[in-house]
Each structure stands twice: as C-alpha cells, then as structure tokens.
C-alpha cells in the first residue's frame, strides 16, 4: 500500500470515483463507505425534487421513527430516567473490524416496535393524566369539605367580603346561611389565585353587590396536567339569593376556569361527603401508583436500548439519503454513484469493499473506477488533534483553493507568537499554560463528557491555548516581565552612581550588554516607558514586515505550482518590488539604526518617521542623514515603486488581450472509452450526469468566459487594494505594540492598587491584608488580565492572520471536503435541534 500523503502543506490530491453497485448490496456498500468515512458523494439528482426521489418513502418512515424516539426521550427526561449510552466506537472506528449493520428486517422491527411503544406509552400517559386530573379534583373537593366550618361560619381567619346589609349577619360562630335567610343559596369551588380578584369584581358588578364572598388559600400548589405547571389556587364560596342568580354565578366562575363542587351546608352532610371522597382518593392513589410503576418499568426498559436504536435508525436514514444521490440503471439493476476521495486512499477503499463482498459471500466484478474530470475537487487537509484547531482558524475565514498552499501550517507558529508579542508576561503565560495543560492531560476524560458551548470551544482549542501560554512565557522572558515585575537573572549592563541623594535625578552608565532580553535596570526609570515604546513600536513594524513578506512568497510558490508565469511577472514581481522598496527599506533602516552606536559617533539618531514622510513629500531632501548616499537610494526606490504601479496594473490585462484566443472546450469524458456495447444504458445515464454537471459549474483553469474588460476591472481593483493595503496592513501591526503596552501598564496598575498596598501593613493586620489583597489580585489577574486581555489579544492575532497575512496569497475559494461518515448523534442535541426547527 502506498504511503499516505501528508496533505498539510497543500491539500490532498483527490480522485473522482464512480461506483457500480448492484442493488442487492447497495445498502451494505453504503454502510461500509459510511464507516470508512472517506467518500464525499456528489448529488447526481440535483434537479430532482426531494419528494420525487427513489427512497423518499423510506426516509419519511425513518423520520417518523426518529420523531417517536425523540418522544420516548422526552418521557425519560420528564420522569428523570437516565439514558443508557452504549459503546459507539464500533460505529465510528474506520480502522477497526467491519461493523455488521442491522438487516432490513431488523430495521422493520424497529419501525413496528416504535409504533407499538408510542401507542402504549401514549395510552399510559393519557391514563395517568386522567387519573391525575381526577386526583386533583378530589383533593380540591376534600379541601373545600375540610374547610366547611371556615366557609359556613363567619370568622376572622378567612378573606371575606360582604356586600349585603351587615345587620343580616350576627356575631362570630353563627351559621351564615341561617343568618342570611332560608332562601339563600351558595356556590363553592376552586379557582386560580390570580383570578380571585377578577371573579370578585365581576360578581359584584353583575349582582350589584347582592352577595357574600369568602376565600381560603390552598397552601400546596396544584399540578395542572394541561400546562404541566404547578399553580397556586384558592377555594371560595359565594352566598346570594335566587336560583337564577346562582346559575349566573356558576357560569361566571366556570368562564374563569373555576372548578365547582357540591358542598352540604350541614356538618353531618359534609362528613359523609368527606368520607366518600377519601375512599375514592384512596382507590385513585392505588391505581395511579400501579400505572406509574408500569410506565416507569417500560421507560427503564426503553432507556437501555433507545440510544442504540436511535444510532441505527439515523445511520439507516443517512444511507437512504446517500442512495437518493445515485442514479438507478433499471436494465442491469445497479446504482451508479460518484464521489471524491483522497487518491492515496483508493487502495483502502478497494480493500474495505473487498472485505464486505467476501463477508456477504457474493461474486461481483470490480465496482470502482477512477474518472478523468475537469470538476473542481474539494479541499482536504489531514489534521490531528494538535493541528485541527489551527486548521479550523483558517477554515473559518475561507476554504483554501484546491492544492494551494495551506495557511494553517504556518499559523501553528505565527498565531501563538503574534499573540505572545501582545500578551508577553511570564506569569500570565504560566497561568495560561497550566490551564491548557489541565485540558491536554485530561483530554480522554473530558472528551467523553457532555460539554457546554463555551467550554467545548476552549477544549477544542486546548493546544492553541497551550502554545499561546508557552510563547507568552518566552516573550515575557524577553521583556523581562513577570506580573509587572522584573527578574534579575543576569548582571545588568548599566551601573548606577554609588552616591546619590533622595529625589535627585541620576543617570546610569553603560558597562556592558545584557545577555538576552530587556535589562532589568530599565524597570522603574523615568524614561523606561519612552524606551519600551520605541522598542516595541519598531519591533511591531519588523514583525509585520516579516510576516507579510513570507506570506507574499507563498503566492510565488502557488504561481509556480500552477504554472502561471503571467501571475509571477504581472503580479508577484511588481508587488514585491513595491512592498520591499518602501516598507522593506523602512525595516532595514530600523535595524541599521539599532546597529549604529550614535553616541560614539557623536551625533543624534535620525528620526525614521520624518525620513519616510519626506521620502514621498520631498524626494531627494534629507534633514538628518542616516547613511551615505541616502538621498539617491530613496529617489531610486521611490521611482521603482512608481514604476511598479502601472506594471501591476497593465501587464496581466495586456497579456490577456494579445494572447488569449477563444477555444471551444469540450467536457472531458467521464467514462472509459472502451466501454462495451452492453453498457449503453449506463453510458446514457453518465452522459446525462455530465450534461447536468456542465450546467452546475464552470470548470477548468484559465479565464474561460471572461473578456478583457473583466480582467482589466479586476486588475484595477487588485492594484488599488494592494497599494493601499501595503500601507494600512503595515500600520495594522502597530497593534502589537499598543496591546503589549496596555497589557504591561494594566498589570502594573493592578499590582500597585492591590497586593502592593498590603506590604505596607505589619503584624496580624499585615497578614490579613496580604491574604485578602492577594486573593483579590489573583482573581482580577485571572479574570481581567488572562481571560479578558487574553481574548482581546487572541482576536487581534486572528485579525492579523486573516487580513494582513492571508490576503497576500490566500485565494480561499475552495470547496470543503465533507465525506459521508457515521457520526454519533446525541439524543439531547437531536431533540433540541428538532424543537428549534419546529419553532422556527
């Protein structure tokens, strides 16, 4: 077997393969390909509506089964029953033994079993709900009966309102009905607590105040089966005269969803009613317990198998969706499918299908052939758990064009390094490294956990965070900065005077060179900020120039690979001369200025900003000469940059105008030329597929379908963008200096305002203040300086890669490689997704 291509510098070489699958093994073949996870199928029926495709009925049937399984899962959640998740590795491991899929009869059993269980569970749920309604009704009835004395005796322990003549009602303890009169009637019931005031107000207006209204709060909330919520309710009684008025009261109460009950006014009658209600409740409790036990037993049995059923059904549905992308040869009863696969995986594909055929015990000819095609293949970069995060950073911006240089490879180093320039602090980098190491060392355990969106994002980028922390420790070492303090590792290159007075300004004398990084003697000096600002600002320009230059040379590698000499001559060379003639020259001047001992020469260091401005505004005029013949060099570079603009603008369009000839391009054959005559129907199908493909996309390289005007407009836009971007992108790298300065200053302020204050106390107070302020300092350091500042620096580094770097070479118009592969489907995610789809 040939060694696999690394496919990290450039995308893997892809092959378009065609499958001739006998109908009897089409399902097994699709299962094998799904487990292998290497083939990205092309839709050969893109013009056929979904409901007109061959296997639409099978997909609808499995959709219904998925709905039923989601219903089962919702019942498990409702009854707090945990779903048993079995071993899913057998479905996902493409390198292990072949997974034997469930047969068609087993899938049919799944369908029948799902329908049977759904019907049975619905019946038990309905029965439980009905019993629950009856139970709630009887419990409310019992509460009213138990509150009879409170209702029928006038007391101070209930809320009551009388709109009748107070002379009709005697002192406490007298029966209200007897006091009001023999003709009085009453209505008792239970109503939601938030509707009590509404009921009372409506009755007062309708009956013109001719009523006596009393309520008692039910302490325990009542479960509402319809809304699946607990509600607070009140029991009430309304006294009034006349049967007609009582009927009106009942209608008003029922319109407000009140439950009305018949309550005897005598103590003996209420006692008999209460005994009967208690007996009925006892019977209901027994029935409800039995029904609930039966329902939970069913659900526990379902919980053990539901995940396995769901995985099998979702895979079966995915199989039919893939088969729906194939064409069917009715004459030979075969399915014809096409798909993209990495060319170095062809042997693996043939071997796996051969194993499947041997397992099935059938004898069929080779069912795979590689097609010559002019279609644009998808872009596939091989990644591992370390490189996947960096690759996803670039893929979020755009998918690389097929076989162009992958921006994700250099990003592995440059992304954390650019971050570290802005975040450079050994202490903060160490905290970030510790956090990332905890994720890396426990990745197997965490990988099996259900993770929230934010934590999953951090876990996926754990290696990115690890490198950001390590690089930050490195740049922090160069900056000599650890929690805003310095480290005196080496002997300083500066010597302070031996004798000085407090408040006196003193000047250090240079006695050597600090071995590596910034000298700790600069810390705390008056001109420390001036020095670090100048150093970091120039460093940012140099880092930006280097980053953009090597990115620009990637475009040369792409032009050479695609054999596009006109892009080299018309785009790369003038662009390189323009960028190097201005910003390359500035970078060389920065390094040269650092290398010269201006104090020894006895003259001030020239300002580079004024030099660059005067280079354009006053060519040939030099205020402070940096080096001999500077004026001539700058005039030459300026003229070279000016020549590069029309060069960049005109060469490629003029080359197109004088050399381009319209040619008729015929589509490449998609089948072998020596096909036998008995394959006529298959050839017709393939020809139809090629015709559809020709309409779907314009393929091939070159400028097919473009005219001189299109090329000219494109080149004008490219020239303007390139010239402006050289300026704006170089200035954009100054964010490296700005964020590094802000991070260092914020770290210093935080130290000064918290833990440094604690060092001024002594004794027990000093210990307490040190502990308290250290906790405050550490919490703010982690929350603000590491998390917030780290996120900000990461986003700025992301911007520098997406815009400033990748714009120099990255086309980003590729197609993503999305092979057909079985994935583990989480039930909770599936239910949430279905709910959101239904709501939208």
Curated annotation (Swiss-Prot):
GO terms for cellular component: fungal-type vacuole; fungal-type vacuole membrane; membrane raft; vacuolar proton-transporting V-type ATPase complex; vacuolar proton-transporting V-type ATPase, V0 domain. It comes from the Eukaryota. Changing residue 593 to A: Reduces ATPase activity. Residues 117-145 form a coiled coil. The chain crosses the membrane at residues 405-423, 426-442, 457-486, 535-554, 573-593, 637-656, 720-744, 766-804. Present with 55714 molecules/cell in log phase SD medium. This is V-type proton ATPase subunit a, vacuolar isoform. It comes from Saccharomyces cerevisiae (strain ATCC 204508 / S288c) (Baker's yeast).
